[in-house]
């Protein structure tokens, strides 16, 4: 994009539309309002007028669940958006129909819009409490990434830019499955050694998948990969970790999901990653065991045994 044509300073007040009023969408709205921006939040269930919310928006942030991405994209397509509006995806998941990331779905419908991925170790409850956090905004359009960086950064929320949107997006998505595995480990009370092994080998698994799909391996060592993985695997605030912990304690998946507010995206990401891995010949043993466990086709103990008894190899 021609940046000079925008005439918009990164520090100028912006008009920000946020799609999704869940925990993350509400947190992003709080961050944007704290920086003096004009913020409008749209929630399908509240019957708000989408056209009114989008009118004049310079930054449009999608913070809906993965299941809501396609319906929201279609709703936005019907209404239309300002031609220079920056589309930001803050969703972590994979589409089970076409095996696409959220940004790929947005890009297919709005190929002319600048696209940005926002991801990182961002437990929304901590951010709402005013605790410090950092994240990454990634785009093939450097100007768009900088616009979003300055729009949301504050003394308590630091944003870095990246030119690898696919890597940033996949890091935030793939780690949800590994977090379930780590939760199972803790639910079984297997100790710090086992947890460290799962996190480390889980990161290697994420890198294998991401690299095969075209992301840069080094991206996964940053905030959106390792950073998000560590936060998600070491906090009871993480829905995915809580799913795994409950399974490790012997609770039925249906009961666990009923007790969790919001969506544990890793539950729905696991089968998609298994399918992608099968298509591309990628080894994802941890994800495979998580998938079997979620489907009720194995037990936590049996899954652990299979992982430990895999053929010995180099790291």
Curated annotation (Swiss-Prot):
UniProt-annotated catalytic positions: 175 (proton acceptor)
Entry keyword annotation includes Cytoplasm: yes
EC number annotated for this UniProt entry: 1.1.1.94
Enzymatic class: oxidoreductase
Reaction(s) catalysed (UniProt annotation): sn-glycerol 3-phosphate + NAD(+) = dihydroxyacetone phosphate + NADH + H(+); sn-glycerol 3-phosphate + NADP(+) = dihydroxyacetone phosphate + NADPH + H(+)
GO molecular function, one term: glycerol-3-phosphate dehydrogenase [NAD(P)+] activity
Family note: Belongs to the NAD-dependent glycerol-3-phosphate dehydrogenase family.
Protein name: Glycerol-3-phosphate dehydrogenase [NAD(P)+]
Compartment(s) where it occurs, according to its Swiss-Prot or TrEMBL record: Cytoplasm
UniProt organism field: Synechococcus sp. (strain JA-2-3B'a(2-13)) (Cyanobacteria bacterium Yellowstone B-Prime)
Record keywords: Cytoplasm, Lipid biosynthesis, Lipid metabolism, NAD, NADP, Nucleotide-binding, Oxidoreductase, Phospholipid biosynthesis, Phospholipid metabolism
An example Gene Ontology CC term for this record: cytosol
Function text: Catalyzes the reduction of the glycolytic intermediate dihydroxyacetone phosphate (DHAP) to sn-glycerol 3-phosphate (G3P), the key precursor for phospholipid synthesis.
Classification via SUPFAM superfamilies: 6-phosphogluconate dehydrogenase C-terminal domain-like, NAD(P)-binding Rossmann-fold domains
Residues that bind sn-glycerol 3-phosphate: 92, 120, 175, 228, 238-240
GO biological process, any: glycerophospholipid metabolic process
Annotated metabolic or biological route of this protein: Membrane lipid metabolism; glycerophospholipid metabolism
Pfam families xrefs: NAD_Gly3P_dh_C, NAD_Gly3P_dh_N
Chain sites annotated for binding NADPH: 24, 44-45, 92, 124, 239, 265
């Amino acid at each position: 994009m021609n940046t000079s044509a925008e005439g918009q300073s990164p520090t100028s007040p912006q008009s920000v539309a946020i799609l999704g009023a869940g925990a993350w969408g509400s947190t992003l709205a709080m961050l944007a309002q704290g920086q003096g921006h004009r913020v409008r939040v749209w929630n399908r269930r509240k019957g708000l007028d989408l056209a009114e919310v989008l009118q004049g928006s310079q930054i449009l942030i999608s913070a809906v669940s993965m299941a809501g991405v396609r319906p929201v994209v279609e709703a936005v397509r019907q209404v239309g958006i300002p031609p220079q509006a920056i589309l930001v995806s803050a969703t972590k998941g994979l589409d089970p129909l076409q095996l696409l990331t959220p940004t790929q779905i947005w890009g297919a419908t709005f190929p002319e819009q600048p696209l940005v991925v926002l991801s990182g170790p961002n437990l929304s409850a901590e951010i709402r409490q005013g605790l410090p956090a950092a994240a990454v905004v990634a785009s093939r359009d450097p100007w768009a990434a900088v616009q979003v960086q300055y729009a949301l950064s504050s003394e308590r929320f630091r944003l870095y830019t990246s030119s690898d949107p696919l890597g940033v997006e996949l890091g935030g998505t793939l780690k949800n499955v590994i977090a379930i595995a780590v939760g199972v480990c803790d639910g079984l009370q297997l100790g710090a050694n086992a947890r460290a092994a799962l996190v480390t080998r889980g990161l290697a698994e994420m890198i294998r998948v991401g690299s095969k799909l075209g992301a840069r391996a080094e991206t996964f060592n940053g905030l959106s990969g390792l950073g998000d993985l560590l936060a998600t695997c070491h906090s009871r605030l993480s829905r995915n970790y809580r799913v795994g912990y409950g399974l490790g304690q012997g609770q039925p998946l249906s009961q666990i999901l009923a007790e969790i507010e919001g969506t544990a995206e890793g539950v729905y990401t696991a089968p998609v990653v298994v399918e992608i891995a099968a298509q591309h010949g990628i080894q994802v043993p941890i994800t495979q065991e998580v998938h079997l466990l979620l489907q009720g086709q194995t037990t936590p103990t049996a899954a652990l045994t299979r992982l430990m008894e895999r053929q010995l190899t180099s790291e």
